[in-house]
Amino acid sequence: MKRRVTALALMLSLTLTACGGGEDGRGQGLFQKASGVEEEAALLTVDGREVPSWRYLYWLRRGCERLREQYRAAGLPLDWNAPVEGGTLADYVKDQALADTVLYATVENWADSHGCVLDEEDRAAMDAAWAERTAAHGGEAAYLRALADMGLDRARMEELTGVG
């Protein structure tokens, strides 16, 4: 438990590295190297469900990119240390990433407790969506590269899609 708390503290302190750092094959790059946290290591537990660190990292990266794009579109310089209500922009994106991570774990818990599982129709819809996305990206290799930029691969994308 102490190791998890230490890892979480380290991960949260390295947010800006995740928001602007270099990349590896899955898009996490410097953040994972600096934190030393394995992608599959349980980062937190939500109502008994262990949540791997890659999920938090995905939502953190997505939040950073979304905020970066909003500032770019508005023609504003992005300062992660800029004060906002409750802290800084970096604090805001960390809080949102944690909230999204917890939300998805909560939905999974609810689905499990109510016996909701993906059926053949759901899986067929996911396959059709995959085909559409790969075509939109110019092929599967290009789509897989785009997913890697988000810290995902096909299995992880399908895992998140199956929840949402």
Regions found by a protein language model. Give the residues of each.
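Residues at structural and domain junctions
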Residues: 5, 42, 96-97, 112
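Charged, solvent-exposed helices and adjacent loops that form client-binding or oligomerization surfaces
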Residues: 64-96, 112-164
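P-loop NTPase catalytic cores that bind/hydrolyze ATP
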Residues: 101
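Short, low-structural-confidence N-terminal segments
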Residues: 1-89
